Amino acid sequence: MSETARTTIDQSEVDRFSAMAAEWWDPTGKFRPLHKFNPVRLAYIRDKVCEQFGRDPKSPQPLKGLRLLDIGCGGGLLSEPMARMGADVLGADASEKNIGIARTHAAGSGVNVDYRAVTAEALAEAGESFDIVLNMEVVEHVADVDFFMTTCAHMVRPGGLMFVATINRTLKAAALAIFAAENVLRWLPRGTHQYEKLVRPEELEKPLEASGMQVTDRTGVFFNPLANQWNLSKDMDVNYMIVAKRPL
């Protein structure tokens, strides 16, 4: 297959999330797990960015002046907080419906985000570049993980960072993140995740490193039902996050 013919888009996944687009900002709706997940991933991103760029994480706008891409942004659950932290945010999603919801919510919230219904490969072909690229809960929904990671890596500026969050392909993840979350607890609609599309850390790190990126941190993330919140963990068997930087 030629490079120009490759695509990161799985249309069935785009259609699935488009059908739920109206619920993005409902903290009790189909995206409730992401609302719960937001505090821990926002803090993680902020702290790692501040560490890399020499910023004060306690500053009201620690990301001020940094250009950030939120790829697969959905309704903007990450894009808006990143913009509030001062980043110049481009929120990209393959779903026109998701982008419509994101634009409407941002307008009502007074947050400035450049939302575009566009693919990662289209942005890369246009020569876009960023200090920070977020791939959060996206890779398990794309058609070609290697191509997606390589494409996104090419948009990271020297000294910049890429964050990836996803679900590991393990039996433990199948039991907890798919069977329990979708069929028992009903946190997610059935069919949200398919086991064969889950991605192991090394399957993300290989194309990143081949693209000149250096993996600088890995962490697991787990849900504590007693505290009703997500926390960082050494256990990467289910949910995990990776940070990679492009050397100067």
From Swiss-Prot:
Q: Which Pfam families match?
A: Methyltransf_23
* GO term, biological process aspect, one: methylation
Q: Which annotated residues bind S-adenosyl-L-methionine?
A: 41, 72, 93, 136
Q: Its Gene Ontology molecular function terms?
A: 2-polyprenyl-6-hydroxyphenol methylase activity; 3-demethylubiquinol 3-O-methyltransferase activity; polyprenyldihydroxybenzoate methyltransferase activity
Could you list this entry's UniProt keywords, alphabetically sorted: Methyltransferase, S-adenosyl-L-methionine, Transferase, Ubiquinone biosynthesis
| Enzyme Commission number | 2.1.1.222, 2.1.1.64
User: What function does the entry list?
Assistant: O-methyltransferase that catalyzes the 2 O-methylation steps in the ubiquinone biosynthetic pathway.
Its recorded name reads Ubiquinone biosynthesis O-methyltransferase
Species of origin: Sinorhizobium fredii (strain NBRC 101917 / NGR234)
